[in-house]
Structure formats: C-alpha cells, structure tokens
Design a protein with these regions (language model features):
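Conserved short histidine dyad/triad with adjacent acidic residue
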Residues: 35-49
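A beta-strand edge to alpha-helix "cap/lid" segment located at domain peripheries
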Residues: 66, 82-83, 110, 118
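A short beta-strand-loop-beta hairpin characteristic of the jelly-roll/cupin
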Residues: 49, 55-79, 89
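Conserved metal-binding segment of the jelly-roll/cupin
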Residues: 40, 77-90, 94
Length: 123
C-alpha cells in the first residue's frame, strides 16, 4: 500500500462493550473517525452534544433520534438511511430494533479515544 494508507477488516478490530446493550469498534484517522456501533433493542443513548460533525448510517435495524435542546424534532432512521448531525446539536437516540450503524465523526471523537465518554457507559 502507498505511504500512509491503512487497511482494516471490521471483524479483526476489538469490540468494546460499553454497556449490556451497547458495543462499538472504531478506526481513527487524522481528521475523521469511522465506527461500527452495535445497539440492542431498547438501548438509549442519552442526550449529548459534541464539537464533531456526525453522520449515522443505519446498516441494520432502526433508531429513533431526538434532535434539539429539548428533543423537539424526532427522526426514525431505518436500514439504508443516513442522518447528518451538525456540531453542537443536542441529540439522543433509542434503538427501536437491534441495530448496527456506521457512524462517521469529523474530527475524531477524543472522548471515545481516551475513554472519557461516560455518558455512553451508563446503562
């Protein structure tokens, strides 16, 4: 491979269990992070916001997102659908079904890298 290019196979990456209902694998580059997120039905991601742009692509299952300071906008995201979340927009999510999503963050989530994402680890 050319200088700097890296190859990964998802199944070869370690899967981090955050709660009984939430696991993830992620790859970090210089300016973006790519993550497989595995949510069991009923998994709740608490309302939070971050300095990172986020794209969530649901590969399997369905998730209900609540967007805005009070969760006033709801979006049901099903397999094959993508939600773009701008930086600093408060949001939460509920896995309506067992779900696998592909999440992209730019820049990478430092709290995920260093394990200080406590809001995700409560459950």
């Amino acid at each position: 491979m050319s200088d700097g290019a890296r190859f990964y196979r998802w199944d070869d990456l370690p899967k981090e269990q955050l709660t009984e209902k939430l696991d993830r694998r992620f790859i970090t580059g210089e300016r973006l992070m790519l993550a497989h997120v595995y949510l069991k039905r009923g998994c709740q991601v608490p309302r939070h916001l971050h300095e990172n742009e986020q794209a969530t692509y649901v590969l399997e299952g369905a998730m209900l997102f609540k967007l805005g300071p009070n969760g006033e906008e709801e979006r049901l995201l099903k397999a094959g659908e993508v939600l773009m979340i701008p930086k600093n927009l408060p949001h939460s999510a509920l896995a309506v079904l067992d779900t696998v999503s592909l999440d992209v963050f730019s820049p990478p989530r430092q709290d995920w890298i260093d394990g200080t994402d406590q809001y995700l680890r409560q459950g």
